[in-house]
Amino acid sequence: MTSWLLLAEAGVPEGGLFDLDATLPLMAIQVVFLTFILNAIFFRPIGRTVEERENYVASSRADAKQKLAQVERLEANLTEQLRGARKQSQTVIAEAEEEVNRLYQEALRMAQAEANNIRESSRREIEIQKAAAIKSLQGDVDRLSNLIVDRLLASR
């Protein structure tokens, strides 16, 4: 405990923090001067760099938003064009199917007409040949019947 008492009796040395001599204002001037120097050397360039980066980020975001809006417009436009192309292709396909069906029906009608014509001409030709064959056979029958009659009469 005596060491505490000795410490308490000891006087405060001079030149402390709260002495009112020229050191306190000199230290204040040094702090202000160092603040200006640090501001000029360190804080302003860093502040400029930070501002430039913020401006770059802001402009990049604005550009990205513009590009995104442009992409969305293009996507909507292309989607609409795709819808139109699909609709047009479906129309073309339907028209082509109708045309093919029409051509098929026309070809079928023509083939049936040609088959009917061939059948009719064949029937006429057969009728002509039949008539010629009957006429020829009639002549042969007449000749044979005359021959038979002559032989029968001759044998009597």
From Swiss-Prot:
It is found in: Plastid, Organellar chromatophore thylakoid membrane. It is a single-pass membrane protein. Coiled coil: none annotated. The keyword Plastid applies. The chain crosses the membrane at residues 23-43. InterPro entries: ATP_synth_b (IPR034679), ATP_synth_B-like_membr_sf (IPR028987), ATP_synth_b/b'su_bac/chlpt (IPR002146), ATP_synthase_B_chain (IPR050059). GO terms for molecular function: proton-transporting ATP synthase activity, rotational mechanism; proton-transporting ATPase activity, rotational mechanism. Keywords: ATP synthesis, CF(0), Hydrogen ion transport, Ion transport, Membrane, Organellar chromatophore, Plastid, Thylakoid, Transmembrane, Transmembrane helix, Transport. One of its GO terms (cellular component) is plastid. The keyword Ion transport applies. Belongs to the ATPase B chain family. In plastids the F-type ATPase is also known as CF(1)CF(0). F(1)F(0) ATP synthase produces ATP from ADP in the presence of a proton or sodium gradient. F-type ATPases consist of two structural domains, F(1) containing the extramembraneous catalytic core and F(0) containing the membrane proton channel, linked together by a central stalk and a peripheral stalk. During catalysis, ATP synthesis in the catalytic domain of F(1) is coupled via a rotary mechanism of the central stalk subunits to proton translocation. Component of the F(0) channel, it forms part of the peripheral stalk, linking F(1) to F(0). The b'-subunit is a diverged and duplicated form of b found in plants and photosynthetic bacteria. F-type ATPases have 2 components, F(1) - the catalytic core - and F(0) - the membrane proton channel. F(1) has five subunits: alpha(3), beta(3), gamma(1), delta(1), epsilon(1). F(0) has four main subunits: a(1), b(1), b'(1) and c(10-14). The alpha and beta chains form an alternating ring which encloses part of the gamma chain. F(1) is attached to F(0) by a central stalk formed by the gamma and epsilon chains, while a peripheral stalk is formed by the delta, b and b' chains. This is ATP synthase subunit b', organellar chromatophore. The gene is atpF2.
